[in-house]
Amino acid sequence: MPKKGVEPVRREQLIRATFQTIDEIGMADATVATIAKKAGLSSGIVAHYFGDKDGLLNAAMRQILRELKEAVARYRADAGDDPRDQLRAIVDGNFDDSQINGTAMRVWLTFWAASMHQPELARLQRANDQRLFSNLCHQFNRLLPHPQARLAARGLAAMIDGLWLRGSLVGGQFNAEKSRRIAYGYIDFQLQAAAL
């Protein structure tokens, strides 16, 4: 009989090993055996906890989505109630170190690519997109008419994704500060245009 409390530890080991494997060789070349070996566990443990490689990728994506949600929540809690500050906090959470380190970026790129072919990952991606849009729209709605708020939210969501994607593909160190400044400029432009 397994020791009490071992399952969460093993699951975490396997998820972290999945991140490392994606970082080192990519998901296409990864096998359950490769990931299990990286975690120092048997392939049978992967099957026991996750079923197969897709189940493990699903769990890994849930983990990185959870980390994103926590980062955004942390920045928002520190930002105060002003809508502009809340919008900036959402931007900051998306460019948090947990989301822009090399491993996280490769995991996100793998997730986005796989979500085009795996319905469960596509569902997770849609939920993530909807959460971002909803959070942005709520804050813009506090200062802009609803149709304009929706448009501004869509634009900022696309800008966040675009800045992140371009930053991930250029190689080298991701310039989070530059990306933040560009996104902040978009927020300021939208809010100033509404004031005219």
UniProtKB/Swiss-Prot annotation:
What pathway does this protein act in?
Amine and polyamine biosynthesis; betaine biosynthesis via choline pathway [regulation]
- Note the superkingdom of the native organism: Bacteria
Q: Which GO terms describe its molecular function?
A: DNA-binding transcription factor activity; transcription cis-regulatory region binding
From the UniProt annotation, which stretches of this protein bind DNA?
31-50
List each copy of the HTH tetR-type domain by range. Answer: 8-68
Tell me, which GO biological process terms does this entry list? glycine betaine biosynthetic process from choline; negative regulation of DNA-templated transcription
- One family name in Pfam for this protein: TetR_C_6
Alphabetical UniProt keywords:
DNA-binding, Repressor, Transcription, Transcription regulation
Write down the InterPro entries for this protein, in alphabetical order: BetI_C, Homeodomain-like_sf, HTH-type_TetR-like_transc_reg, HTH_TetR, Tet_transcr_reg_TetR-rel_C_sf, Tscrpt_rep_BetI
Gene3D superfamilies annotated for this entry? Answer: Tetracycline Repressor, domain 2
- Listed PROSITE patterns: HTH_TETR_2 (PS50977)
> What exactly does this protein do?
Repressor involved in the biosynthesis of the osmoprotectant glycine betaine. It represses transcription of the choline transporter BetT and the genes of BetAB involved in the synthesis of glycine betaine.
Entry protein name: HTH-type transcriptional regulator BetI
Q: What is the lineage of its organism?
A: Bacteria, Pseudomonadati, Pseudomonadota, Gammaproteobacteria, Lysobacterales
